[in-house]
Amino acid sequence: MRKKNATIKSVEVETQTDMTMREIETILKIVANTNNDNNDNNNDNEIEHETTIVIADKADKIDKIKKKLEFLDSVYQPEQRTPEWYQHRHGLITASSVWKVFGSQSTQNQLIYEKCAPIDVEKYNKVNTESSLHWGQKYEQLSKDLYEMLNGTKIREFGCIKHPNPEYYFIGASPDGINVCPLSRLYGRMLEIKNVVSREITGIPKEDYWIQMQIQMEVCRLPECDFLETKFVEYEDESAFDSDSNKENDEIKWNYNVEGKRRGVIVYFIKNDKPFYEYTPLTITSKSQFDQWFEKVVQSYDGITWIKNIYWRLEVYSCVLVLRDKAWFNSAIPKIQELWKTVETEKVTGYEHRAPKRRIVKKNDTISQNKKQTKLEFNDDGSFSQQHIENEKICHSGLFL
């Protein structure tokens, strides 16, 4: 009996692969033959039947996920960062913006104005490495690496995807990634990453993030999404990084600080006037391994400007499962459709009245250190004004230490 249970368990694990129906039938025959070699009783037969159902259910689920991912792969995608790609995104209400449909009138006006106005591709080529937006981009790959390592899986991006239903042609989503490893229990689960700068991580998604994930799951027709929030802290310099470690453990636990928190290094380069990063592999556990890796990285980018090494520590890692809510989408879609009809109409009749109102800043105005109280200021094209950008810098000062 013990031998049979062990066989059944191993078959269940093996069926979490990318299988064809022929392979599934072969596995079922193996199970049947193995069971015939034992002295079965009625209880054994019940176990065999239940196991066969489990295997078939898992195989069917894997096959469905595989077909969905193949469909997402087949969706037309303009080459990233090209004018066509920016235009493609501009012609959609993307998942990260849908929450604005349910916001105040001024928030809706902002979205309508943004979608009606001609796209300015040049503004996307500008990079502010001190912004919270860039902070999130900088740590996104590292968050993915940690997620993959902790869950034994593989994440892939699928670009900006339009809703497969032609009726909702104006809705799009760009998920941070989808689990594509068929051996993983997370196969087919989506991933949304938020690299927090200062906000407290509670494990409960903000409403706009929840809406974003619902739209992503709706567009990709997948039932689950992991909401991953991380909070990284950067050391002032290498000396501060070195002092936050046990020297005796530098050859076995260099990637953890004295409190047992994971840490590492990002190598910061500039190429074509834009930053790009190389991340220390999470498998590196000693100072000597890092030194060898760093030397190879610098040599491989010979001729490209190395700026500095960024030394980081992971303070918080929170991952929460969010399930698809079809009922919510069905109740929300009429309002999303209504706003898009307004966009299409006012592209013809005029949208200038939707422009954000300019605000004159008085000399005695003070800037709140609370980001929620910072007043938004926009240019005529709907982008943040320089004054707002400066305010944001002040609000975030001291958060990158």
For the regions a language model picked out, list residue spans one by one.
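Accessory terminal regions of nucleic-acid processing enzymes
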Residues: 1-401
